[in-house]
Amino acid sequence: MLKDGLFTRFPRPAFALSLHDDDTMPAGTIGYHPGFFRSMSDAVTITVYGRGGHAAMPHNTVDPIVLAARIVLALQTVVARENNPVDPVVITVGSIHGGTTGNVIPDEVRLQLSVRTYTADVRARTLAAIRRIAKGEALAAGAPREPQVEAPERGNAPVYNDPALTARLAGALKRGLGEDRVIEMPQKMTSEDFAEYGLAGVPSVLLHIGAVDAVKLAAARQTGIPVPAPHSPEWAPEREPTLKGAIRAEVTAMLELLRVN
């Protein structure tokens, strides 16, 4: 919408407010965090090339599946050994595609990564490390050509909740919904393109709405088995209390922002 000229075709808003469902809080509970709240995200694709052949004669091939496996493991050393632990990084390989059947070694394998960081410097170092590891492992494996690493020039920006606006809304929500229904949350490594409104100069706040039955959440904490999270096919928010809590929170926030002192 912003790229399509939202703020030139229509008046620029005084504030931007958003709600996102959450699997860590009881349904209807509101969570907030001032300052940086959600991370940057980058979608990275690595294609590694080998020399395919018969599965019974791997000595005549350069196996890109083994090469891909080495890369997957080596990437975690970026998180564990190259990055300062106080500057969080997540590298997840969420998809690997290679081959068509069990008795054929393929010519190539494609890996799809999700990379999460908070600062531009850490992001740049992490993406450079991914390229270095992919190329280094391919060289060590004797691959016939360098891997192809595709990364965006600019991924999703981090969500920054305007501290003054966050404090104002948190106070209004606590008065309207109750102190026990509004809690301060830690930062998360998930991302959200709502950040673009803040980058456009609009004071903005992203709030979370708990969407899990309180009894189920308590049981999950007791057993250590987490409830299904967003992006899981089993994610099923408690509809009525979640919607009611979200509506009450939005209305309360709107009334606060529209209030004339």
Give the label of every model feature segment.
Residues M1-I96, T100-P106:
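Histidine/acidic-residue-rich, glycine-tolerant segments that coordinate divalent metal ions
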Residues A69-N261:
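Metal-dependent amide/peptide-bond hydrolase catalytic core
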